[in-house]
């Protein structure tokens, strides 16, 4: 195989249990987001926009829709050997060594595919998660990795201490070399001088290739290991003296974007997913989807334009502060602060507000829907209310989150 300078490895095998029922029939990175995208699209765009074109996507859990999406819509030409996005399903590649096991953790997923790294002989390996919403110039992080002569570089993001229990938490010295790593601690240590904030690992790493091999081979021999980067590999690397540095995500320059890079969302819970979706409908969103110099590619499905019809009395088709995909029809209803995916139809006298409606949802007449996520292929009968009586919503079998967001599963029948 052809040699490359930087090899991308995207971890896309997560089960995403905290996103259930959105992950009942799809992998977490395949969950739709932003009216036309899937979550995996954002990290793929980051690699491609950064000029890193040699990418493997490691899959495992309910990967069919993710596989189809990438195979159909993320294809380079056939004539450039160093330009590829290839899916790598869990396949017990080290069966003779490990026995009949799937990926046992994030580190093991890479370990079981080290032969792919070896084939390309890269100078650095970029190991990124496939389930975050952000823009990142990965090339800038790679250059920082080279400049610091790091063995491992970890992208870092300041978060409130109260939220840091969901992340790996970093302690750094004045040169941003990491001195301690805590994986999802119960009592996160704050950033020195900022007692209300902690420095969170974004789960995105750049490895010197030789260091990656050394660390993963040692981890595979450790029968007590969880075979996870955050739980074992990174803390051990710091402990035994590898050069492990934090990279300040806020200093990451995005072409066409002024000021610090502030937006990164781990959409690993239903409430986090919902809030990230609501971020998009703000008048001036921090995370914008429209940039000619940092394009966000996804499937081109050739949907017809969105359509708004009727303007008689209260029967007015309109959408305010919302994102609408192709094929949406708002027929005499009102949509406010919402995200509507392809071919959604909102019929007359209905109100949809602060909600996310996936492909092919139809809202009957005189419905009221608020603070909801409705998965694909749901037909809502006339006069239905969702998000107004949470006990009734629970009785219907809907999920109600701690923040009161109602989630209707795919294909639900009333």
Curated annotation (Swiss-Prot):
Enzyme class: transferase
Pfam families: Hexapep_GlmU (PF24894), NTP_transferase (PF00483)
GO molecular function, one term: glucose-1-phosphate adenylyltransferase activity
Gene3D superfamilies: Hexapeptide repeat proteins (2.160.10.10), Spore Coat Polysaccharide Biosynthesis Protein SpsA, Chain A (3.90.550.10)
UniProt keyword list: ATP-binding, Carbohydrate metabolism, Glycogen biosynthesis, Glycogen metabolism, Nucleotide-binding, Nucleotidyltransferase, Transferase
E.C. designation(s): 2.7.7.27
Pathway: Glycan biosynthesis; glycogen biosynthesis
Catalyzed reactions: alpha-D-glucose 1-phosphate + ATP + H(+) = ADP-alpha-D-glucose + diphosphate
Listed GO biological process terms: glycogen biosynthetic process
Residues annotated as binding alpha-D-glucose 1-phosphate: 103, 168, 183-184, 201
Coiled coil (residue ranges): none
Subunit structure: Homotetramer.
PANTHER family, alphabetized: GLUCOSE-1-PHOSPHATE ADENYLYLTRANSFERASE (PTHR43523:SF2), GLUCOSE-1-PHOSPHATE ADENYLYLTRANSFERASE-RELATED (PTHR43523)
Function: Involved in the biosynthesis of ADP-glucose, a building block required for the elongation reactions to produce glycogen. Catalyzes the reaction between ATP and alpha-D-glucose 1-phosphate (G1P) to produce pyrophosphate and ADP-Glc.
Family membership noted in the UniProt record: Belongs to the bacterial/plant glucose-1-phosphate adenylyltransferase family.
Name recorded for this polypeptide: Glucose-1-phosphate adenylyltransferase
Biological classification of the source: Bacteria, Thermotogati, Deinococcota, Deinococci, Thermales
């Amino acid at each position: 195989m052809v040699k490359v300078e930087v090899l991308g490895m995207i971890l896309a095998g997560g089960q995403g249990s905290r996103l259930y029922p959105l992950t009942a029939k799809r992998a977490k990175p395949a969950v739709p987001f932003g009216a036309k995208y899937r979550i995996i699209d954002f990290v793929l765009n980051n690699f491609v926009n950064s000029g890193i074109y040699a990418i493997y996507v490691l899959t495992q859990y309910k990967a069919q829709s993710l596989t189809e999406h990438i195979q159909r819509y993320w294809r380079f030409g056939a004539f450039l050997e160093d330009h590829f996005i290839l899916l790598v399903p869990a396949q017990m590649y080290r069966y003779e060594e490990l026995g009949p096991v799937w990926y046992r953790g994030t580190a093991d997923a890479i370990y079981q595919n080290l032969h792919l790294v070896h084939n390309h002989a890269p100078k650095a390996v970029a190991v990124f998660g496939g389930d975050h919403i952000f823009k990142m110039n990965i090339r800038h992080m790679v250059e920082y990795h080279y400049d610091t002569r790091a063995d491992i570089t970890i992208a870092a993001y300041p978060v409130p201490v109260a939220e840091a229990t969901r992340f790996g938490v970093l302690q750094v010295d004045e040169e941003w070399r990491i001195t301690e790593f805590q994986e999802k601690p119960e009592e996160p240590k704050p950033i020195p001088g900022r007692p209300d904030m902690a420095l969170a690992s974004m789960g995105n790493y750049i490895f010197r290739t030789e260091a990656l091999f050394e660390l993963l081979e040692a981890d595979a021999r450790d029968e007590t290991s969880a075979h996870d980067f955050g739980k074992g590999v990174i803390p051990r690397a710091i402990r035994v003296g590898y050069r492990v540095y934090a990279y300040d995500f806020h200093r990451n320059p995005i072409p066409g974007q002024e000021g610090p890079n502030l937006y990164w969302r781990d959409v690993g819970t239903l409430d986090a997913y919902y809030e990230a979706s609501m971020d998009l409908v703000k008048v001036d969103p921090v995370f914008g989807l429209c940039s000619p110099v940092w394009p966000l590619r996804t499937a081109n499905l050739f949907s017809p334009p969105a359509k708004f019809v009727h303007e008689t009395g209260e029967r007015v088709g309109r959408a305010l502060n919302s994102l609408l995909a192709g094929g949406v029809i708002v027929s005499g209803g009102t949509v406010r602060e919402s995200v509507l995916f392809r071919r959604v139809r909102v019929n007359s006298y209905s109100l949809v507000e602060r909600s996310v409606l996936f492909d092919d949802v139809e809202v009957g007449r005189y419905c009221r829907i608020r603070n909801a996520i409705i998965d694909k292929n749901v037909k809502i009968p006339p006069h239905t209310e969702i998000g107004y009586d949470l006990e009734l919503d629970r009785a219907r079998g809907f999920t109600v989150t701690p923040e009161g967001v109602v989630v209707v599963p795919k294909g639900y029948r009333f």
